[in-house]
Amino acid sequence: MKKAIVLSLGLFLFAPSLVFSNTLTLKIGLFFPTFKSDLWETEFDQMDFKKSDYYNTNFGFSFDYFVTRQLSLVLSIDSYSKNKSGYYKGYVGYLAETLGMTDDFAFPYIPDKFDGDYDPNHSFNVTITPIQASLKLLPLGRKGKFIPYVGGGIGVYIWNVKLFGDTIFFSDEYIYSDPDTGEDVPVYPINPGADYSDIRENNRFSIGYHALGGIMIPVANRTTLELEFKYNFIKGKLENFEGFEPFDLGGYQLSIGINYWF
């Protein structure tokens, strides 16, 4: 539903450019994040998430205005969103009441020894909506059985990152002395001072860049099939996820679309 609202708003904003546009493109594709920042790495190290869990379909549209037979200006909007819930790997949670403490604590999972009261878990959501301006070069022009193109440009990326649920504070280590063996066991507080964690970066804006290439294949009068590869370079500064470097919002995008030529 959110994707539909964003795309409808984008179509409304860009509708005036149809007067000058030569091509309207509607497309669907797959987005593969590049995961090149420490918050991504932390999630994959600590949680039972896989990188493939964050590969997802995306939708978009674009308008092309041809400056010459071989060069066009492009305005485009795409949309990506993925939410995944998972469990911490190798840890169980004990309730504060069980321990006689003020906070829940995470213990290393050891069968028949530390089985826990529950399994600590949280959801991690990423949403990215790029609004991009590109220059597209068609070296062979706009006519032919195959119409290849390359290009690139700049964009404004609207994005959200959200974590909701349990957070184990591995930076705050305590020592639990096992009464049976006398062994010292490192343990960690869960959501200290709160029932759950709710960390959000809402409706943030960042500037990014992209490169693209593809091919258009005529299939009917005024209609071509488009296959496109796009790579986005973008990182967003985090404010509420304290201690983390800028978040990698970039990735690879493979899409298929239909072009209507005006």
Where are these regions (language model features)?
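Cleavable N-terminal export/targeting peptides
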Residues: 1-23
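Short glycine/proline- and aromatic-enriched beta-strand/turn motifs that initiate or cap beta-hairpins
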Residues: 20-65, 259-261
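Repeated loop/turn-to-beta-strand initiation elements of outer-membrane beta-barrel proteins
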Residues: 24, 70-73, 143, 221-225
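Residues on the lipid-exposed face of transmembrane beta-strands in outer-membrane beta-barrel proteins
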Residues: 30, 61-65, 77, 131-139, ...
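Extracellular/periplasm-exposed beta-strand and loop segments of Gram-negative cell-envelope proteins
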Residues: 34-54, 81-129, 157-206, 234-251
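Predominantly the C-terminal beta-signal and adjacent terminal strand-loop region
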Residues: 48, 101, 211, 216-262
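Hydrophobic core residues within well-ordered beta-strands of beta-rich domains
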Residues: 57, 71, 129-131, 148, ...
